[in-house]
Amino acid sequence: MHPRDQTIFALSSGRPPSAIAVVRVSGAQAGLVLTTLAGKLPAPRQASRRLLRDGTGQPIDDAVVLWFPGPASATGEDVAEFHAHGGRAVLAALLAAISVIPNMRAAEPGEFTRRAFENGKLDLTEAEGLDDLIHADTDRQRRQALRQLQGLLGNRARDWRERIIEASALIEAGIDFSDEGDVPAELRAPAVKAIKALHVEITEVLAAQGHSERLRDGMVVAIAGEPNVGKSTLMNQLARRDVAIVSPHAGTTRDVIEVQLDLDGYPVTVIDTAGIRETDDPVEQEGVRRARARAEDADLVLWLVEGEQAADPASMRSLWTSGDGSHPSGGSVWIVRNKIDLGEFGDEGPQGEFGISASRGDGIRELVDALVKFSAEFFGTSEGALVTRARQRDLLRQASDSLRRSLELVGEGEELAAEELRSAAYALGRLLGRVDVEDVLGAIFQKFCIGK
């Protein structure tokens, strides 16, 4: 029996113990599972309280069951759900009772969602939105993922694809007239108009995305500087907990330490790095190497100095493996003066420099406010973004390029223009997951948890 013909089951809720646990079953045997464990089938889409029994008649649990006959279900197949008590022993007995029923097997990661995709319940962009929603850590990530799940990009892509196919039909119909002379204007003109409009729409979407793809992974901020200037103390202040060891001894931080922050809904990864200095200690040398590598990839570097100490350009240049002290990948660098409680310095100094006391917390609120403002500018207009993944951007760019080439060719050779339109429609079909996407399905659905 093909794996997709088997009925699958899995725990779909969180790890036990819990108050309630949900076990989901999908496939042709879902109804049999319900009747075997709970007696007769309940009314579709209505909760029913049942005493669950295993194959020998032994009671398992007093639970709520639901029945969703396909295709009107989440996966498009027959689906059964058991809402049982979330104790480990209860779930072990329930899953064991299901597993011994013929043609049953445990679901693989993301398999319920993959079956929903294969049965037309959602397209690939919506599946990606679901994946993002499951992994969202901040409210802005949640809102962006939910819009994708609700079809923000998928609906537009379907409309574009249908219009491309209509324009292609006009062009190809004109080819039939080629033996009799030029393609009739009543066929070419509306096709060209439609192609121009489509090209403009897709190009505008690509141009307006800003850092929307980055909202999924977040912005990276590296705290860097010479040893023992308070980098780890600042890290703990930003995290509001002790995540880094603080010591008066220089070189305490040997490895890169990361913490995930939610700054007004913006996902930010803050990195505490080893102090930048020349050293003979091989372990510290490796820490410095890693610090430089992560700082070079950061979107923003907070270069920490002590009080009124000048920000030594040579020290800052030493942070990068090459260059003149500016960020090698175009990121921003802020000077943050620590230990202002030991000298005269305001909350914010010249040229956007910040004054803080990491040990007392002075100036931290102002620094965080500046980070929130920087995050808003960095992520830009990602609130209504259509494109949230590199895969989506690449396929939209392919479609846009094909539309542009079709416009260039439509007056020279209708066959070539029609071929470019087919390429554009094909790219959008891949975007939606409707053509030739087997190579990406595994990569997407394997990231889902088991039971989803």
Swiss-Prot record:
EC number: 3.6.-.-
Ranges for domain TrmE-type G: 218-376
Subcellular localization(s) per the UniProt record: Cytoplasm
Binding site for (6S)-5-formyl-5,6,7,8-tetrahydrofolate: R24, E81, K121, K452
Top-level taxon in the UniProt lineage: Bacteria
One GO cellular component term noted in the UniProt record for this chain: cytoplasm
GO biological process: tRNA methylation; tRNA wobble uridine modification
Entry keyword set: Cytoplasm, GTP-binding, Hydrolase, Magnesium, Metal-binding, Nucleotide-binding, Potassium, tRNA processing
Residues passing through the membrane, by range: none
Protein residues bound to Mg(2+): S232, T253
Cofactor: K(+)
InterPro entries: G_TrmE, GTP-bd, GTP-bd_TrmE_N, GTPase_MnmE, MnmE_dom2, MnmE_helical, P-loop_NTPase, Small_GTP-bd
Annotated positions binding GTP: 228-233, 247-253, 272-275
Enzyme class: hydrolase
GO molecular function, one term: metal ion binding
Keyword flag NADP: no
Entry's cofactor comment: Binds 1 potassium ion per subunit.
Record's function text: Exhibits a very high intrinsic GTPase hydrolysis rate. Involved in the addition of a carboxymethylaminomethyl (cmnm) group at the wobble position (U34) of certain tRNAs, forming tRNA-cmnm(5)s(2)U34.
Family per record: Belongs to the TRAFAC class TrmE-Era-EngA-EngB-Septin-like GTPase superfamily. TrmE GTPase family.
HAMAP family, per the entry: GTPase_MnmE (MF_00379)
UniProt subunit comment: Homodimer. Heterotetramer of two MnmE and two MnmG subunits.
NCBIfam families on file: mnmE_trmE_thdF, PRK05291.1-3, small_GTP
Protein name, entry field: tRNA modification GTPase MnmE
Gene source species: Bradyrhizobium diazoefficiens (strain JCM 10833 / BCRC 13528 / IAM 13628 / NBRC 14792 / USDA 110)
